[in-house]
Amino acid sequence: MFRSLLKRTTFLNQLNKSNGFNRNYFKQSTLTRSDALSRHVETEDNNEHTPFDFTQENLVKVEKILAKYPKQYRQSALIPLLDLAQRQNGGWISLRAMDKVAHICGIAPMTAYEVASFYTMFNRTKIGENFVQVCTTTPCMLRGSGEIIKTCKSHLGIQVGETTPDNKFTLVEVECLGACVNAPMMCINDDFYEDLTSASTINLLDQIKNNKPTKIGPQTHRKAAEGPQGKTTLLEPPVGPTCRDDL
């Protein structure tokens, strides 16, 4: 066992010294926040007595969501209602919030707990005001996501999975966010920031910290997912109609 571990360590050290390999590429993925706690832990702000109810504004949204499904299939609204509760609750979903959603959907609370703990988009512990999710899947890794993670940790003064003392930022690693062609990238709350460098990452974090507007999308000159040389094909206006008239 020891000899096998020693061989593996020697192999990774050799890779680390050659060809710019980073031994972090061979480590296990960071646990997602939904898996960070496999069971509920009572805290002062998250227990069976912590109050939660939808605001009047969100109750209207609840009815609109439920109206999309037949009455006998109210449980189909579980995920959008959990999302609505999470947004109202500052980016995380409490035990009582899950109970409330389960009651509205007419399902057992355990079903809501299972869904919230399965999908990584639901946070069952508190997060900061800005949820920084850096993609570290293969395309982003090959394009330098390791350096982006290192920059975030250094500039924010926290490790992956931690929140800054001022509660401004929470930093996590995530799996593919679907913007591989614009790697490396990260998602902060609902916005994608792509084609990142260490310099542009620091600039973005500073802008957000100071409540200044940011450039969403590619942080370079290119538009959307076009190549680095710009648009080279399909230069003529598209032949219509391209979609239904009522959209």
Swiss-Prot record:
Keyword Flavoprotein: no
A cellular-component GO term for this protein: respiratory chain complex I
EC number annotated for this UniProt entry: 7.1.1.2
Role, per record: Core subunit of the mitochondrial membrane respiratory chain NADH dehydrogenase (Complex I) that is believed to belong to the minimal assembly required for catalysis. Complex I functions in the transfer of electrons from NADH to the respiratory chain. The immediate electron acceptor for the enzyme is believed to be ubiquinone.
TM region(s), chain numbering: none
InterPro entries: NuoE-like (IPR002023), NuoE_dom (IPR042128), NuoE_N (IPR041921), Thioredoxin-like_sf (IPR036249)
Protein name, entry field: NADH dehydrogenase [ubiquinone] flavoprotein 2, mitochondrial
Chemical reaction(s) catalysed: a ubiquinone + NADH + 5 H(+)(in) = a ubiquinol + NAD(+) + 4 H(+)(out)
Molecular-function GO terms, alphabetical: 2 iron, 2 sulfur cluster binding; metal ion binding; NADH dehydrogenase (ubiquinone) activity
Gene: ndufv2
Cofactor binding summary note: Binds 1 [2Fe-2S] cluster.
Cell compartment(s), UniProt: Mitochondrion inner membrane
Subunit structure of this chain's protein: Complex I is composed of 45 different subunits. This is a component of the flavoprotein-sulfur (FP) fragment of the enzyme.
Cofactors, names only: [2Fe-2S] cluster
Pfam families named among the record's database cross-references: 2Fe-2S_thioredx
Family (UniProt): Belongs to the complex I 24 kDa subunit family.
GO biological process, one term: mitochondrial electron transport, NADH to ubiquinone
Enzyme superclass (EC): translocase
Alphabetized CDD domains for the sequence: TRX_Fd_NuoE (cd03064)
Boundaries of the annotated transit peptide in chain numbering: 1-40
